[in-house]
């Protein structure tokens, strides 16, 4: 055991030395870029500031004073360059540390695969899903208790707006590309050999140096939403389905009789729905953001379906397919000329044809979003237009069941299972959009709608009685009635009307909850319930108690 411990410590020290070397190499590359673009004097100042800062951290008063004097003497242009140099340096350090963690994880996974099953190296990594499952089993959790536990798992991660976030998506994309170059450089056998050229890293650093760090104009709400969606597009859609797969794998190994949970991890967002204190979050903005969410989900799903259709080329001459697959295929065979062409080209590949038809429907849904006005009363109300998430899920389930019933059970895993996980997590809406408004706005709107100028002065009991009576007879308002209302009341009702349209056209999964800021009484919730009835919305109401 002692020898093993010493070996692990030695390995850890070597790994940390590799990280330090990577950081020094990146710092050197940054220095060369600064020298080439700004000149050697700028780099000399960077090094002086760095040296003084390190000394001042050890308590050197003279160094601290010199640091302050040096910074005070900088011109605005040189001060900007120094700020850029240190900002970019720490971004590079962050990239190196992230890559270091990824490298460690990969090494540990590889070591686990090659280790003796009885050795310590074969144990799952700490904080992994399998590690948690094993710990629960060791604590005596039986199958029935485990089934109840996983059935009750419900995790929703919520994105919120941060108006102070100034980093542009352009910079995020550049940093991501640089991170990929560093990863490829660390493993040249598996990647692009051109990335091994040090000049490749320096070109990326130079591009970052010469790119504006901040937006020229203040970001609009839709820009904030696009920045949030960037993380979905670049990382989450690719990574999160693996968590579902990890859960299934861990349960299969350690609790084979326990059924893995479905849809236990989802996302929500406040960006584009939180109008408390932000007049820029209008109903039109909410509709736009819902469209952005929907479009990304449809495009991601469409791409995955196309890839799957190219791989799931099982021939019905080699393997029988279920009647359910035949029925779905019959219903969609004449969806378009393209599907008819696929049918004539691949007449004996039913899964490919069925997925091709689904891809066609996803493409039509994307075109509908691109056309705009999908969440308006003027949009065409074609019953065949909406593409329900459940219809997509049913197609995947039918294909999976057909494969498992025959000799293609292996094909029901892999890409098909991953696309099912993707749908479970993101649906066809990416993230549920929560709506939020201050209770005072609801109170003012209700006062106008009930024609009670004294409404705010009523005591709680009187408000409840009045609202209960109003709720009993409330019906959705028509266009004529809405047109007569004040702008402030329309600002309260219109987002709810958009929510009702989104639930109808995108499905209820597109919306999350309705949050009431500064809730202090039951009447605050009854007011929102009344407003929901007037607009046809049906969001769960979540009171937010604040001080």
Where are these regions (language model features)?
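Active-site beta-loop-alpha junctions enriched in small/polar residues
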Residues: 272, 435, 516-519, 544-547
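Often metal-dependent polyanion-binding catalytic scaffolds in large enzymes
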Residues: 1-470, 488-491, 539
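Core mixed alpha/beta domains of very large multi-subunit molecular machines
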Residues: 442-446, 453-542
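Alpha-helix N-cap recognition
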Residues: 388-391, 521, 547
């Amino acid at each position: 055991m002692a020898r093993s411990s010493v070996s692990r410590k030695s390995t850890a020290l070597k790994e940390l030395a590799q990280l330090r070397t990577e950081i020094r190499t990146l710092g050197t590359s940054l220095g060369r870029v600064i020298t080439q673009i700004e000149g050697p004097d700028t780099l000399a100042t960077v090094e002086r500031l760095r040296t003084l800062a390190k000394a001042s951290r050890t308590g050197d008063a003279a160094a601290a004073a010199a640091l302050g004097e040096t910074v005070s003497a900088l011109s605005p242009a040189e001060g900007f360059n120094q700020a850029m140099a240190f900002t970019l340096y720490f971004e590079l350090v962050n990239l190196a540390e992230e890559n270091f963690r990824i490298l460690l994880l990969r090494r540990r996974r590889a070591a686990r695969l090659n280790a003796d099953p009885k050795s310590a190296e074969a144990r799952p990594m700490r904080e992994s899903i399998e590690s948690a499952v094993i710990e629960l089993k060791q604590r005596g959790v039986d199958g029935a208790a485990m089934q109840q536990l996983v059935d009750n798992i419900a995790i929703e991660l919520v994105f919120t707006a941060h108006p102070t976030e100034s980093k542009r998506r352009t910079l995020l994309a550049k940093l991501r590309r640089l991170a990929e170059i560093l990863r490829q450089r660390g493993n040249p056998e598996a990647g692009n050999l051109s990335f091994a050229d040090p000049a490749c890293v320096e070109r990326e650093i130079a591009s970052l140096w010469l790119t504006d760090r901040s937006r020229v104009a203040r970001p609009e709400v839709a820009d904030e939403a696009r920045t949030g969606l960037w993380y979905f597009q670049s990382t989450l859609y690719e990574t999160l389905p693996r968590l579902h797969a990890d859960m299934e794998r861990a349960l299969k190994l350690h609790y084979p009789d326990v059924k893995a949970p479905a849809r236990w991890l989802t996302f929500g967002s406040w960006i584009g729905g939180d109008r408390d204190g932000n007049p820029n979050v209008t109903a039109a903005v909410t509709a736009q953001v819902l469209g952005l969410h929907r479009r990304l989900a449809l495009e991601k799903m469409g791409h995955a379906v196309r890839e799957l259709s190219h791989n799931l080329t099982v021939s019905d001459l080699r393997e029988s397919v279920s009647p359910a697959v035949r029925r779905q295929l019959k219903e969609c065979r004449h969806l378009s000329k393209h599907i008819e062409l696929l049918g004539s080209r691949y007449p004996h590949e039913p899964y490919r044809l069925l997925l091709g038809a689904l891809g066609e429907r996803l493409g039509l849904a994307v075109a509908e979003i691109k056309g705009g006005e999908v969440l308006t009363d003027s949009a065409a109300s074609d019953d065949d237009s909406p593409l329900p998430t459940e219809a997509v899920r049913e197609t995947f389930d039918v294909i999976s069941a057909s494969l498992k019933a025959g000799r293609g059970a292996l094909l029901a895993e892999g890409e098909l299972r991953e696309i099912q996980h993707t749908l479970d997590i993101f649906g066809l809406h990416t993230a549920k959009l929560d709506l939020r408004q201050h209770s005072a706005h609801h109170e003012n709107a209700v006062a106008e709608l009930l024609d009670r100028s004294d409404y705010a002065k009523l005591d709680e009991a009187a408000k409840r009685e009045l609202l209960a009576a109003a709720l009993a007879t409330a019906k959705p308002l028509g266009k004529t009635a809405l047109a007569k209302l004040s702008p402030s009341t329309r600002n309260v009702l219109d987002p709810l009307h958009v929510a009702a349209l989104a639930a109808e056209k995108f499905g209820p999964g597109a919306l999350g909850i309705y949050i009431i800021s500064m809730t202090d009484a039951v009447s605050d919730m009854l007011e929102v319930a009344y407003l929901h009835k007037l607009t046809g919305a049906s969001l769960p109401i979540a009171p937010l108690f604040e001080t």
